[in-house]
Amino acid sequence: LRVYDKLAGKHYFKYFKKDAFLSLNPHIRQDKFLGASQFSDAVTDDSRLVMRVLDEAIHDGAHAINYLKAESLITTEQGLVVGATLKDTSPQHSTHTYDVQAKVVVSATGAWADTLRMQASQQTEQTFHKQIRPSRGSHLVVSQERLPLNQAYTFLHPVDKRAIFVFPWENRTVLGTTDLDHPPLDDTEVGITNAEVDYLLTATNDLFDDVDISRKDVISSWAGVR
């Protein structure tokens, strides 16, 4: 963290001894730590960021089409990618496909990138060397009345020592994230599992004193694959 401060040219890092930290954060369990460090990080509204990028792209001449899946790549006999077969996955037209030719095809498919890479390489599932390991991250949202916070916390899970975050967001409190290998990707909607809910609740209740957050306190959840 001190190295980050040095690179940024600003000083955000600060260390608190146990008594000093507890005076500012009395709801933290006293038997769980010896001290704490303060640092600065970035935050963004990912939904608004996506919409802003789409708006800017459309303004510059792009066409943004929802519910359109890159089903497969169109290649020449020499293996050159010259387009893609697109599938309309909207409920009204779930069987329609369209072949679109292009001078350049850019794959910005995230965790699904290996699927198109395998097609472009014309290899099989058995011979293709995958470079992407899909991982699922899930979060819980509870009310600020049940877990009032005025700043974000990062700490280690008591079971597997993974980093967990708890932070205030839009008059709510967010608990997250998990990090699990995701099964082979398909069109199934990604969602949090019961085991992940228990995992996040265990971590939160271990850090905060007399909170006892349970499933009935969960307002909503979300999950994503990276």
Model-predicted regions and their roles:
Residues 80-85, 150-151:
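Short, hydrophobic/aromatic-rich segments at coil-to-beta transitions
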Residues 1-24:
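Dinucleotide-binding Rossmann-like beta1-alpha1 core, especially the glycine-rich loop
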Residues 99, 103, 107-121, 126-226:
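Active-site substrate-recognition segment that forms the wall
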Residues 68, 88, 202-206:
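Flavin (primarily FAD) cofactor-binding/catalytic cores of flavoenzymes
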Residues 66-82:
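A conserved short coil-to-beta-strand element within the FAD-binding core of flavoproteins
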Residues 86-94, 144, 157-158:
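Short acidic, glycine-rich loop/turn motifs
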Residues 22-60, 83-85, 92, 99-100, ...:
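Helix-loop-beta segment of a Rossmann-like dinucleotide-binding subdomain
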